[in-house]
């Protein structure tokens, strides 16, 4: 085993003194990018929970708020976000510090290297918190369906795309005049708009089949 390790050793040709640590900087930068994606994920889930798109199972041993006992906070995702942010600040420092050394021989790297484990530990804690949080949430289909039903304007994109396919003149402007009036867009108004279009009846039938629940943007 020792022989195999020895064979894998390579000279670091750019330096004649301490190692240049470029490989460590690359690792830390990559981990920081991964953590940034997870921070964004945590914030998205937090937002979906606040919008009631996801519900959380209640743990009677957890305290949601010191003032409001009824609150069920997304504490696992908040915990994860905090740990990932802290880990990233250290990863950024390490990747910027370690490649720098006075004439490739100062010892500032020695104390810094002793703290490499810190951001990894916070990242592991964050990952565990994400897993814990995901196991506590469920999709609230009722709220999502209600939200979709109250937002018929989302089908305007699909209608415009089909009108372009049929070479309908200025479809964007037609939908803009419908949707940007300050008035609520509902199924009835969409239907009235479609009925007034100068297109084939088969196209009108196709357009009326589109609704917020079955249109996915494709």
Question: Which residue stretches match the model-derived regions?
Answer:
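Short, small-residue-biased leader/transition segments that mark boundaries at the very start
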Residues: 1-6
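A short, charged helix-loop
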Residues: 7-16
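Generic secretory/membrane-interface signal
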Residues: 13-14, 38, 105, 207
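Short, surface-exposed helix-loop/turn micro-motifs enriched in polar/charged residues
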Residues: 15-16, 55, 171, 186
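Glycine-rich anion/phosphate-binding loop at the beta-strand->alpha-helix junction
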Residues: 16-102
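Catalytic-core signal marking the mid-to-C-terminal active-site face
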Residues: 63-218
């Amino acid at each position: 085993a020792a022989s195999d390790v020895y064979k894998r050793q390579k000279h670091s040709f750019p330096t004649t003194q301490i190692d240049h640590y470029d490989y460590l900087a690359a690792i830390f930068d990559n981990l920081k990018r991964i953590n940034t994606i997870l921070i964004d994920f945590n914030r998205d889930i937090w937002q979906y929970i606040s919008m009631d798109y996801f519900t959380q199972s209640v743990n009677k041993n957890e305290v949601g708020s010191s003032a409001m006992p009824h609150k069920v906070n997304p504490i696992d995702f908040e915990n994860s976000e905090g740990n990932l942010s802290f880990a990233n600040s250290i990863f950024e420092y390490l990747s910027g510090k370690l490649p720098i050394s006075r004439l490739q021989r100062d010892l500032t790297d020695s104390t810094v290297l002793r703290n490499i484990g810190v951001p990894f530990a916070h990242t592991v804690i964050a990952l565990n918190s994400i897993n814990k949080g995901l196991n506590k949430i469920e999709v609230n289909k009722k709220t999502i369906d209600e939200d979709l039903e109250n937002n018929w304007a989302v089908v305007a994109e699909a209608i415009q795309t089909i009108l372009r396919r049929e070479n309908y003149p200025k479809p964007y402007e037609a939908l803009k005049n419908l949707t940007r009036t300050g008035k609520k867009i509902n199924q009835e108004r969409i239907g009235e708009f479609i009925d007034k279009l100068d297109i084939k009846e088969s196209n009108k039938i196709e357009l009326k089949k589109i609704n917020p629940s079955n249109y996915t943007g494709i």
